[in-house]
Amino acid sequence: MNIIQQYEAREIERLSGVRAVPEFIAGDTVRVGVRVVEGTRERVQSFEGVVIARSNKGLNSNFTVRKISNGEGVERVFPLYAPSIASIEVVRRGKVRRAKLYYLRGRSGKSARIAERPRDLPKADSMAAS
């Protein structure tokens, strides 16, 4: 591991201690709390939508969230470890078979829906032990 990788690993560990980053993948619906500064006041604005892409590049990891606002598609790219992100909450888990869901850009209505992933069931050996 070179010096840059060591530095990035330390920073990721430090930033993960400040704010927990939940496990999520493309297809999941997330609510991202973004810190917005208006004059002297600071407030948290939420942005809720479907994760259509996730790029894992260490400290430079980011994810793209898409939502429909007033009939218009809005996409926003968030750096995963940005200090402007107050919180990331997974609202629901989607079942998809792709890593990038760019095809949702051309769809609207029912064709843009994503099926919900069933909850993880307990394993059979843990059931037998009970």
Swiss-Prot record:
GO molecular function, one term: structural constituent of ribosome
Lineage: superkingdom: Bacteria
InterPro entries: Ribosomal_bL19, Ribosomal_bL19_CS, Ribosomal_bL19_sf, Translation_prot_SH3-like_sf
One GO term (biological process): translation
Gene3D superfamilies hit by this protein: 2.30.30.790
Alphabetically ordered keywords of this record: Ribonucleoprotein, Ribosomal protein
Keyword Ribonucleoprotein (UniProt): yes
GO cellular component terms, A-Z: cytosolic large ribosomal subunit
Presence of the UniProt keyword Ribonucleoprotein in the record: yes
Stored PANTHER family: LARGE RIBOSOMAL SUBUNIT PROTEIN BL19M (PTHR15680:SF9), RIBOSOMAL PROTEIN L19 (PTHR15680)
Purpose of the protein: This protein is located at the 30S-50S ribosomal subunit interface and may play a role in the structure and function of the aminoacyl-tRNA binding site.
Family: Belongs to the bacterial ribosomal protein bL19 family.
Alphabetized HAMAP family for the sequence: Ribosomal_bL19
Protein name per UniProt: Large ribosomal subunit protein bL19
